[in-house]
């Protein structure tokens, strides 16, 4: 799965690999002021957004199967902007910075989710691999509220996908009003 569509549209450098998922090669956000330096993602026209949206439209036009798209969750996108390690550490050291970055990334995620819905998606999958780094308490402060904002923004089901060891977080996941859960080990 490609978690770099939103980050690339924000101007972050992406390294594409032949046989693996793309990597974000720089995490430029160190302070809330750095958010203003990011590129305007221009949802739905910037970066590779049009490719994703056209794929959804094509699937809907040529098939009766349900079509859905992937989104980097607000916390995962914030982790790409700051680095997963920095966002995780700063949940304890600088929660105000985390919330500023999360507010910004949530707007991008919500706009992309709405664009996918407008393109005809029957559902979206909110990819949240970074949440497995958090305790349940930190999840409920720094992930859950932003997942809820995405769910509230669209009128289609949102499936929450979380990678890694998630057993400790399952009670938190069920508090999120998502249409489905996809857990990975």
Regions found by a protein language model. Give the residues of each.
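Active-site loop segments of alpha/beta catalytic cores
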Residues: 41-185
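A contiguous, low-structure linker/loop signature
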Residues: 2-42, 58-62
């Amino acid at each position: 799965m490609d978690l770099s569509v939103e980050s690339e549209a924000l101007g972050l450098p992406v390294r594409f690999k032949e046989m693996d998922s793309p990597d974000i090669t720089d995490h430029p956000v160190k302070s809330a002021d750095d958010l203003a330096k990011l590129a305007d993602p221009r949802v739905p026209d910037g970066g590779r957004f049009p490719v994703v949206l056209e794929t959804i439209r094509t699937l809907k036009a040529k098939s009766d199967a349900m079509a859905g798209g992937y989104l980097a969750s607000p916390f995962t996108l914030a982790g790409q902007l700051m680095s997963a390690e920095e966002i995780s550490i700063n949940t304890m050291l600088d929660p105000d910075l985390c919330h500023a970055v999360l507010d910004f990334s949530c707007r991008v995620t919500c706009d992309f989710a709405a664009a996918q819905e407008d393109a005809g998606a029957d559902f979206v999958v909110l990819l949240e691999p970074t949440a497995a780094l958090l305790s349940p308490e930190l999840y409920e402060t720094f992930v859950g509220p932003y997942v809820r904002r995405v769910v509230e923004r669209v009128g289609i089901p949102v499936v929450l996908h979380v990678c890694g060891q998630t057993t400790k977080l399952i009670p938190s996941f069920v508090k999120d009003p998502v249409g489905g859960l996809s857990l990975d080990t």
